[in-house]
Amino acid sequence: MKWKHLPLLVMISLLTLSKKHLLLAQLIPDPEDLERGNDNGTPAPTSDNDDNSLGYTGSRLRQEDFPPRIVEHPSDLIVSKGEPATLNCKAEGRPTPTIEWYKGGERVETDKDDPRSHRMLLPSGSLFFLRIVHGRKSRPDEGVYICVARNYLGEAVSHNASLEVAILRDDFRQNPSDVMVAVGEPAVMECQPPRGHPEPTISWKKDGSPLDDKDERITIRGGKLMITYTRKSDAGKYVCVGTNMVGERESKVADVTVLERPSFVKRPSNLAVTVDDSAEFKCEARGDPVPTFGWRKDDGELPKSRYEIRDDHTLKIRKVTAGDMGSYTCVAENMVGKAEASATLTVQEPPHFVVKPRDQVVALGRTVTFQCEATGNPQPAIFWRREGSQNLLFSYQPPQSSSRFSVSQTGDLTVTNVQRSDVGYYICQTLNVAGSIITKAYLEVTDVIADRPPPVIRQGPVNQTVAVDGTLTLSCVATGSPVPTILWRKDGVLVSTQDSRIKQLESGVLQIRYAKLGDTGRYTCTASTPSGEATWSAYIEVQEFGVPVQPPRPTDPNLIPSAPSKPEVTDVSKNTVTLLWQPNLNSGATPTSYIIEAFSHASGSSWQTVAENVKTETFAIKGLKPNAIYLFLVRAANAYGISDPSQISDPVKTQDVPPTTQGVDHKQVQRELGNVVLHLHNPTILSSSSVEVHWTVDQQSQYIQGYKILYRPSGASHGESEWLVFEVRTPTKNSVVIPDLRKGVNYEIKARPFFNEFQGADSEIKFAKTLEERPSAPPRSVTVSKNDGNGTAILVTWQPPPEDTQNGMVQEYKVWCLGNETRYHINKTVDGSTFSVVIPFLVPGIRYSVEVAASTGAGPGVKSEPQFIQLDSHGNPVSPEDQVSLAQQISDVVKQPAFIAGIGAACWIILMVFSIWLYRHRKKRNGLSSTYAGIRKVPSFTFTPTVTYQRGGEAVSSGGRPGLLNISEPATQPWLADTWPNTGNSHNDCSINCCTASNGNSDSNLTTYSRPADCIANYNNQLDNKQTNLMLPESTVYGDVDLSNKINEMKTFNSPNLKDGRFVNPSGQPTPYATTQLIQANLINNMNNGGGDSSEKHWKPPGQQKQEVAPIQYNIMEQNKLNKDYRANDTILPTIPYNHSYDQNTGGSYNSSDRGSSTSGSQGHKKGARTPKAPKQGGMNWADLLPPPPAHPPPHSNSEEYSMSVDESYDQEMPCPVPPARMYLQQDELEEEEAERGPTPPVRGAASSPAAVSYSHQSTATLTPSPQEELQPMLQDCPEDLGHMPHPPDRRRQPVSPPPPPRPISPPHTYGYISGPLVSDMDTDAPEEEEDEADMEVAKMQTRRLLLRGLEQTPASSVGDLESSVTGSMINGWGSASEEDNISSGRSSVSSSDGSFFTDADFAQAVAAAAEYAGLKVARRQMQDAAGRRHFHASQCPRPTSPVSTDSNMSAAVIQKARPTKKQKHQPGHLRREAYTDDLPPPPVPPPAIKSPSVQSKAQLEARPIMGPKLASIEARADRSSDRKGGSYKGREALDGRQVTDLRTSPGDPREAQEQPNEGKARGTKTAKRDLPPAKTHLIPEDILPYCRPTFPTSNNPRDPSSSSSMSSRGSGSRQREQANVGRRNMAEMQVLGGFERGDENNEELEETES
């Protein structure tokens, strides 16, 4: 946009406008654009590539300018005090924006404001500080800054940038302290630097030099310096250094002293002395500092007054006693540690007997054992000898198989297989270094006794309580060999059976009758055999009288467990035997516990209970004697009792003492173990819980049985804990892994050899620290509270985790204070010795969660449970119930980026779905742009415009669409909403019931059509199909017609290229169809180039006798002839169906051309959607409006290719000729109807131009010759030909390919009319109807005069609202043209807002006959033509109503007529037909210029039936019923059933027609139009034109009245009623029907109901 065209004042004012005003200002049109506009001030249209699609261009003020944008944002700065600083900010914009700085919301003063200011605003927009001013009280430069860039288009704000002044205080918050550690121990120094900003970093210096932190032993973490393994070289002076950008600060000096633990130079040795001797232990150690020495006794105190410690640290004990024996430890200790060395003092003591042997009596052959046990120090050796014998038996001697004598390790003498010679004394002697003692015992041998186990009591007595005088029964069942003897004892006294009350049965049961109180006591059953005895006891209580006694409940044997299996021995040791058994689950109850009994001769002669209440099936019996034979049995028990005993186990012998320990010299063992020296290596750390220990033995000994590894935690925190022992019993091993250690703990470890109870000297102590792990428990007692010192700070406190879960040394604690957004997060880290932290600067209103975790060297551990806190605006904590409010939770969720992204994505998806739906909806609307206006609102009708095409070298105006019509395709036609199948070619009935044969076919065969064009199309299609054996669908009835692809075929044309009623393309050739002239041009080019498929066969009748064909058929054939004239090289050009493209050379199909039209008549209805049901009509039927056939057929030329004779076209067995599959409509039809009905109104939105069809809301006229002159000859021809149609033989063609899909056309005489009533006009009153009648009659006369003069007529009446009709503002105007001008009449002056479609008068005269034929009384006026013949002005042929027509703006004059009442009864069908036939005028005479080879005879026309008013009235009622039902499908069927399209028949042979006078009406001549007399003012019923009712052939018998399976239920009653004889209707019937009034319909309804 050029600025020079705008006033300067506007430019200045625009600089101050906001963005919103600028957008409005951009819509100001440019003056040059206004000058280029139309004269009336409308904006000039822009070119296709213009960005402005509104048709005008707006002002673009300073198009190159744009608002500011920050390209470089300032960043945070930390500057030292007094130092210069720069905050960068760069912005771009046009004009160049100005930059200002703000701090804390206030504008920053720079040198531009005050030259003395230390702040400078650089040209780039950066803010430069000459120096940073910062004091204790005044801090002018510190704060948060933003830069703002502005120009007249707006402003841009940068990000926040904080400028902070760096500080570093002098005093350290914590100075490192002196450290004193031992070599090998870790050293830790802690330092907290001075407060500063930014937080200073920490480094260390040693002896004035930076500390080398590359040493892997040295770790600097936070303020801590850790040396893991100190050396002597680590000693020195250490300084902590804190550094930030201000400088550095040094802490106080800390001394690190590395000391040495004590280590022994000479360890004490084990000693063995005799009683009353002295014992000395020497000890010598070194260390730094020099250690101090001490002695202690491990298991007691040093003997008082008998020990001394010499200056050389030697321990001396005088007069040693046996109590002094033990382990003595030398302790060397200094300030960094201590060392210990132990030695054992052994005091030798003379032996003494502990167990002396006793005399034994044993049976011959048995085994006997003498026990002898002695103690002493050292342990005395025991040996046996038989008195009088020198053979000694020692315990350490290996057993000899030939000897029956042996001595156990404990000193017991055992004699097996005793013989009588073994009788005598046996001497036990014990001996050690301190002395010896002797004892003896006598062995007596008796007779042989069976070596059997003692008896076993299977079931013994149970405790009982009985009343006085009650009966007691005590059972005792025992087994043994021999049978055991059972005795009963009471409280240890044998029960006497002399008392008559007491009786012992043979089975051993003891029975006591008449019990007394004295019978109370413990009863014992003893079962005895020579091998031993068994006992079982029970307590019996006798109660006095009056005391309730619970009698013993008899025990069910099934409730007691069964005996377990025989126990098996699984393991045997010196004093332990392990048994295994299984319960008996096959019988008895499940046991809950077990009882184990054992027997051994070494322990006595009876069974002993060794274990009770055993819960498992395996048990280890301990405490057994070594080298003894044992027998075992097991009993099962539960709450109900004890089971029988199991089988006795096999004998098992416990192990003897190992022979290696026999005969050992204790002093020698102790001496050798004391000389063993172990060297322990540094332990290897394997994991956090295991350490591997290695050692070497300097001096091996045969008495090393194993090693004991002793370990314990070390450190002050653990104190002097006890040593833990891990034994290694393999002398050859020199390493072991100690498991189950604590994590991160320092251990001290040592090793010690041992032999039985003897132990050697300890090795040196080694230290090992297990690996650390993260703490496995969170800190305890975490609390969050308000800090008193700061308004927005909180105090977090905690306690360390439990020690066993720390898994190392806690080095620090991490504190997380998390807000609901990351910008509010605050994290803190404190030292491991700190248990609280203050977190400042919390944002009020933000809910924080605080978590604490302890951190070791392995990292942070488990976090504590979140503690929530929220501060209000005053800094006070909010109560917990308020913290987690629903609003806060919702706010937290809404602020989450994921939620925002999800909402955005959902909105985008919804928008895309809606856009797709809207696009598809609009696309369907555009696709339905070929639908007629109001197709979804009111059943209406649209007629076909006049189209010119070439015929025989001259332009001929066709009243129909110049397109192929074919209904022979399957039921997939896009123009049918409820596509019902057509009849197949197997049907013999004629396609249109125009002359119902005498076979009696009634209305059941009636085929309903949506429009007269459908009837005409089907008439010709069926004729062609009869000739070609085309396969047709099954049904004869169609539903709603989908006209979505046909709107472009219904257009009016107004173009200078219209010549003589023909459209002439720029090349001079007439175009058959205005909207498809480009396609026709391509077709012409294609035909000239030999286009088309030469192999495609064309329709050609067989060479048989020709019959004359109706002019309708001739019109189609003539057009086919025209198309064939375009062929080149005899190549046949297939005609194009309306809804299919011919091929790629056709230039596009009619369908594609129509879609592009975007006419406004589509109303956005979907393709294929069923149209709504027709509203009520006042008895009107569109069949009344169907015009007669043309009176002047075109001349015959090459008729064998384009048409067929009557012989070829008609089947002898058919009631009427079959329509051809392809047909064109003829101009003459329009001419003869135009004169009768007035000018043809166009469909809205259609226009024509020489090059293409233009679509707009401007009105165009239709060049249509007035067809009024053509009406009277049809009136004359029709009655003679009706009902007398001959039946020529069947002539069929053989098709090569199926015909293209059908394209319905509107007949020329109906183009542009509205056939359906307005929805708003359905329920009008009778007075309004009378007024409309008067208006219609006045308009008729006026329109008649206009038509005679060939003038334009502008409609003036409003025809309904926009909801249910197409208003005049949305459609084109129309007008008629005089033929003498040969040019288009001017555009109609229809206003875009007048809301009219056509005049009431013109429409009224077109529907007058329809109204009266339907049973309405209409004021009729007769008119006289040039010849003086009287005729009616309205059309006489009935025309069916179309439910899908776009003529939704029917004139109110027609709609609002009241239904006539019936005045007289119906006459019989034949009478009616005769009466009507007699009153018909003679047929017309065709002009000589047009000759038809196939004109039907008058007799043929007479043979055709007509459509009676009964059908019309019935259909009208069906229409009203369907409207009341709200458009239900049933109503729809009723609507479809009554839409009968009657095809007009041909007027007869043209030769006869030429001979008959035309009474001054010469069709196609201008004179005839000028000379028409004024219209008659009244019409008479006799002038109603008869019309044929169409029908389809059915799949049944041609004469089967039920072949129409898809007929409407509304029409079925009428068809059944007339089935007997309605094949043809005579003229008398029509005459009677024409006189119907309102009452006729009522009677008809009664008749229909009765039928």
Swiss-Prot record:
Protein name per its UniProtKB record: Roundabout homolog 1
Quaternary context: Homodimer. Dimerization is mediated by the extracellular domain and is independent of SLIT liganding. Interacts with SLIT1. Interacts with SLIT2. Interacts with FLRT3. Interacts with MYO9B (via Rho-GAP domain).
Biased composition (Basic and acidic residues): 1281-1293, 1516-1541, 1549-1573
Keywords: Cell membrane, Cell projection, Chemotaxis, Developmental protein, Differentiation, Disulfide bond, Glycoprotein, Immunoglobulin domain, Membrane, Neurogenesis, Phosphoprotein, Receptor, Repeat, Signal, Transmembrane, Transmembrane helix, Ubl conjugation
Function: Receptor for SLIT1 and SLIT2 that mediates cellular responses to molecular guidance cues in cellular migration, including axonal navigation at the ventral midline of the neural tube and projection of axons to different regions during neuronal development. Interaction with the intracellular domain of FLRT3 mediates axon attraction towards cells expressing NTN1. In axon growth cones, the silencing of the attractive effect of NTN1 by SLIT2 may require the formation of a ROBO1-DCC complex.
Covalent S-S links between cysteines: C89-C147, C191-C240, C283-C330, C372-C428, C476-C525
Modified residues (Phosphoserine): S940, S1055, S1297
Gene: Robo1
Source domain of life: Eukaryota
PTM text: Ubiquitinated. May be deubiquitinated by USP33.
Matching Gene3D superfamilies: Immunoglobulins
Segments traversing the membrane: 898-918
List of glycosylated residues: N160, N463, N790, N820, N827
GO BP term (any one): negative regulation of chemokine-mediated signaling pathway
Annotated signal sequence range: 1-25
UniProt cross-references to InterPro entries, sorted A to Z: FN3_dom, FN3_sf, Ig-like_dom, Ig-like_dom_sf, Ig-like_fold, Ig_I-set, Ig_sub, Ig_sub2
Occurrences of domain Ig-like C2-type (ranges): 68-164, 170-257, 262-346, 351-446, 455-541
Extracellular side: 26-897
GO CC term, one of those recorded: neuronal cell body
Tissue: Expressed in embryonal brain and spinal cord.
Chain intervals with Polar residues compositional bias: 39-56, 1255-1269, 1438-1451, 1592-1601
Native organism taxonomy: Eukaryota, Metazoa, Chordata, Craniata, Vertebrata
Subcellular location(s) of the protein: Cell membrane; Cell projection, Axon; Endoplasmic reticulum-Golgi intermediate compartment membrane
Modification type Phosphotyrosine: residues: Y1038, Y1073, Y1114
CDD domains assigned to the protein according to its UniProt record, in alphabetical order: FN3, IgC_1_Robo, IgI_2_Robo, IgI_3_Robo, IgI_4_Robo, IgI_5_Robo
Membrane topology: Single-pass type I membrane protein; Single-pass membrane protein
